[in-house]
């Protein structure tokens, strides 16, 4: 009897943990519509399919291959070359010029205009990679 109750509680706890993992993460919107999600484990989903992953060491994987890297100082690399930077104030630079910004409230600005939004934003650099650096077709 006690074993059965324990197993039921363990299964309920496992189910709750699974639901929480799937709920957490950055929901990405463009033009008001949900277009993707960065899950808490780093998986990148576009239109429901996993298309890549942000590794904890900064590597950016697209379709299983390492395509780039997010450096600790904010530099964004693609195939080894620096292609841009996420500044500490959340400005986005490409080729040295400021082209956009990730606002603290999650709004994504490109040349001053809001082009999207990241809800429950957990990592500004990952969000910037999704909208500005072309690793994923967002």
Regions found by a protein language model. Name each.
Residues 2-45, 49-51, 56-57, 65-67, ...:
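Long terminal segments
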């Amino acid at each position: 009897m006690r074993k059965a109750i324990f197993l039921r509680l363990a299964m309920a706890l496992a189910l709750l943990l699974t639901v929480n993992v799937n709920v957490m993460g950055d929901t990405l919107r463009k033009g008001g519509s949900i277009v993707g999600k960065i899950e808490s484990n780093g998986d990148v989903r576009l239109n429901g399919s996993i298309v890549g992953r942000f590794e904890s060491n900064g590597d950016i994987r697209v379709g299983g291959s390492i395509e780039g890297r997010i450096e600790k100082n904010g530099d964004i690399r693609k195939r080894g070359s620096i292609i841009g930077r996420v500044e500490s104030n959340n400005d986005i630079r490409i080729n040295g010029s400021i082209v956009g910004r990730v606002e603290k409230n999650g709004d994504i600005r490109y040349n001053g205009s809001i082009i999207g939004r990241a809800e429950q934003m957990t990592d500004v650099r990952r969000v910037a990679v999704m909208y500005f650096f072309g690793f994923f077709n967002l």
